[in-house]
């Protein structure tokens, strides 16, 4: 505590922003999933919510710093107030064996905030598809196609976003109807190429065709370019409003986000201005001009109240 206050503040902020270690993807399927659970609350709209979370609340260095002594408690509080002006968090998201998603919060500087400036999401691909791993998770998961529902993975990714907006960092609530309305100025999504995998091993999802018989298990690894296109198509579809269903599920984006940026290995692929997308949604056969105008008026009011970008129609 004899260091100058400026240096102590730098050390404190460094400690608060230092990420926790993300799971090691060289572990086996069983090692990565054995301690994880599929949360029940809140009630999600996603058709498939097969996402396995750690049952323990996300950890943060903030709590330990606050408990050291009165002086450090006070200084940490002051630094948290500064960080709260531009709150940031980061999420590690593993797609394991093309079947399940494993989210892990690695940075949570301000755990109790509901208004975030930036959310960094890193997609990592782990393992190869093995049919025997599918059985505990039911018939609809991963890239398998559902009757009229598209690949389950689009809903699993949607469920991660929906649960975050509704439940925050903990991912779970006591009540089914809880909605914390977490907002973010920007979500940065970076899809990373698995290290130490030769390009010729990359391929399309091996579990996307459940009725096709195979004599042996595939040896391919999910292609990060395919995954980037998959995420791009599904996120873009939610904000285009091509039909009532897409528009209906896209409302959670319209009401809680300003911008989504999609990258692969740090290189930008697509950038969506959510307010601009909302402005440009047009009526279609299942949504009258009057109903759309009514919704937009409500959505703009919500965005204004939540400090998000608002445009003139």
PLM feature spans:
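C-terminal-biased hydrophobic
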Residues: 9, 52-297, 307
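N-terminal Skp1-binding subsegment of the F-box domain
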Residues: 1-35, 39-52, 63-64, 71
